[in-house]
Regions:
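Sec-dependent bacterial lipoprotein signal peptides
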Residues: 1-19
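Beta-strand-dominated extracellular/periplasmic modules and repeats
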Residues: 21-141
Length: 141
């Protein structure tokens, strides 16, 4: 699970880097709430939307302490590509002084099912304009 989360975070950083800087890549915005087993996701869960259509730019967001997120292409451009998107989730590990990875306190115990990480089967449609897309993660087997 740790390696998959690292891969997901690595892919996020890669996609952010290749999209570059800009002001607006689309007229679509996406906000919402992520819940895990019915309760709000803790601060720091990464949400990624990858357009199914070739050539689309991925978007990402991080949950706040109430589970809310807002998608952005990079630090200066908010938004998401309209159309069908693959949605995936991840958590970002930090490193201590010795380089040992650990999860920050709010993310300890967070379980993201493998099918919602890399190669996720979850899809959501983004309409032009403002979108409110709430996302539910269930950890039940």
């Amino acid at each position: 699970m740790y390696q998959k989360s690292i891969v997901v975070v690595g892919l996020t950083l890669y996609f952010v880097a290749i999209t570059g800087c800009g002001t607006s890549l689309t007229d679509s915005t996406v906000t919402g709430v992520v819940t895990i087993d019915g309760g709000p996701a803790p601060e720091g869960v990464t949400v990624m939307f990858q357009p199914v259509k070739a050539g689309g730019s991925p978007s990402y967001g991080k949950t706040d302490s109430q589970g809310r997120y807002e998608l952005q292409y990079n630090a200066s451009a908010k938004g998401a590509n309209s159309g069908d998107n693959v949605v995936s989730f991840g958590v970002e590990y930090m490193e201590d002084e010795e380089g040992v990875p650990f999860l920050p306190e709010p993310l300890k115990g967070v379980k993201i099912p493998a099918e919602l990480q890399e190669n996720s089967s979850l899809r959501k449609n983004v309409e032009p304009g403002r979108n409110e897309i709430d996302l539910e993660i269930s950890t039940a087997n």
